[in-house]
């Protein structure tokens, strides 16, 4: 399952659960779980709403991290295999 792929990252970050990287990591896990759930249950609109809320939170955290520390942002993006933010 998805949880098993990120165990090493989670063990590494267990002492710093409040860090931006750990929060983005946990939101990414939730997003992947909800996405697989919604593939089976297409009409679960409350889960769709929750997914959109989590996506927004992760997007705001990634924007913050990209402004504060671009190197850590790039490493996190590559490690979690997610796309970069769209810039205006």
Swiss-Prot record:
Which SUPFAM superfamilies does the UniProt record give?
Answer: S15/NS1 RNA-binding domain
Tell me what this protein is called. Answer: Small ribosomal subunit protein uS15c
User: Which terms under GO biological process does the entry name?
Assistant: translation
Query: What Pfam families does UniProt report for this protein, alphabetically?
Result: Ribosomal_S15
What keywords does the record list, in alphabetical order? Chloroplast, Plastid, Ribonucleoprotein, Ribosomal protein
| Molecular function terms from GO | structural constituent of ribosome
**What protein family does this chain belong to?**
Belongs to the universal ribosomal protein uS15 family.
InterPro entries per the UniProt record, alphabetical: Ribosomal_uS15, Ribosomal_uS15_bac-type, uS15_NS1_RNA-bd_sf
Superkingdom field: Eukaryota
Instruction: Spell out the NCBIfam families in the cross-references.
Output: S15_bact
State the organism of origin. Answer: Capsella bursa-pastoris (Shepherd's purse)
Name of the encoding gene: rps15
Subunit structure, as described in the record? Part of the 30S ribosomal subunit.
